[in-house]
Amino acid sequence: MKSIAVCAVCYNRKDSLARLLSSLDAACYPVPVTLIISIDRSDTTAVEEYADGYVWRHGEKRVVKHQKNLGLRRHILSIGDWLEEFDAIVVLEDDIYVAPSFYYYAQQCVERFADDMGVAGISLYKYPYCADSRQPFMPMVTDSDVFLMKRAVSWGQVWMREQWLEFKKWYDVHSEPFGVLPHLPRGVCEWPESSWLKYHIRYCIEEDKSFVVPYTSLSTCFCDLGTHAVKRQTHTQTVLLQGEKRHWNLNPTVTYDGFFEAECLYGHFSEVLGVRKEELCIDLYGSKGNRMGRRYWLTREQLPFKVVRSYALEMKPWELNVLHEIEGREIFLYDTSVGAKRPHEPDNDKKADYYLYSTDLDVRSILREKVMKTLVDAKHAVFGQNEE
């Protein structure tokens, strides 16, 4: 059995740490677990005092108090040093909250993927949206409990010894600041230099490494105010697995790239049209912009190029419309080497909004309810709550 420690990474947010530790305390553990509380130097001792007094009921507790301020990037990366002692480590920043079964999941994933060097790490977190476009992210569902994504995760993750050592070798060569690169998400490139995650994401994309991601999240993020958050937000909250689940089917057959695009579409177009992967830009979320200059471009944008194929925006997730050849005029495969008149589909933006954000309710009904509520609120403001 692999040894797996849990590390709570802290700075100056005592209440955040207390919330994280409450979720860890309520979780299920099949074996004694070492809890590491790693605290970066700040101008308060409240976090250190809380950590010292905290009683960990599930195994050994170790409190690390850094005497100098490392900063977020150096602090997070230093956690990897614990892999000299443990086979794997669950890394949790203090604004994370874990599901009761997170350790069972981590344990089984480590046993399954520890020798797979194509896997860079294990995510506890499942994105509810594409991090680059902020549109809903719906992965294709299979009989597996996990899928693969060529993008590192920071809102609950597991690092394994051999995979981490390989990343560290890469990082030691690529640790210098970098600007916008065409093969990386623009937003990631523009993150501040205090970000460690931008380097791990770059590593996954450039070295063709994947994170294992659950279909149902084992962690969620409160996005508390801190180094990279200037206001409280809820978009990082995701559906959290409840109850005690002890067994996972860990046979991923679906892979997404670092831009949240389905990699199976490369194989589809290779089989159907003979288009090679190196010639194709899959850009359904619109985050790539074909900055690599690929000849074929799959996108929802209406562009002045020859349309090779077009598809509907009906099945979910949207890549199924392509895989099942559902004809329509919402998704276009262009040959950018041939200029042509732009497609004229003026209602496509509205259709996309309805497709992405509506429920079974008609959009007009939703708008009608909003208008009526506004009128009622205005009436109450003028005449009082009890006015008929």
What are these regions (language model features)?
Residues M1-L92, I96-E388:
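Peripheral/terminal regions associated with large enzymatic or DNA-binding modules
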